Amino acid sequence: MEYIRLGHTGLEVSRICLGCMSFGEVGRGPHNWTLEEEASRSILKQSIENGINFFDTANGYSAGSSEEILGRAVADFARRDEVVIATKVFIPMRSGRIGSSKPLLGSDKRHYVK
């Protein structure tokens, strides 16, 4: 795997960034074409074993379940300091599900900095 510097951050990331929009719990979020956790973990494990250390996800991908699956896979297959996770926090979520009428969740810094 080839690696490059990520801007001026000092981080080295794989030239391939694995997008995780297709990973998630079916029924959470606006689309039903996501891969369930078992299939997602298989892809993530192979990716890590082949040197991919750069992953892209978002709070709105399957209403957060993409981030959850990625987090568990990283915990099982890599050291957290060996991977770079790019995410987005702009997608309004209500009660963990897109489109719910309940109050917004996860829109503050405290939700993302753990």
Regions found by a protein language model. Give the residues of each.
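N-terminal binding-site loop/beta-alpha segment at the start of enzyme catalytic domains
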Residues: 1-84
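Glycine/proline-rich, positively charged
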Residues: 27, 96-114
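Proline-centered turn/helix-capping motifs that create local helix->coil transitions or kinks
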Residues: 79, 94-96
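Active-site-proximal loop/turn and secondary-structure-junction residues that shape catalytic pockets
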Residues: 22, 89-93
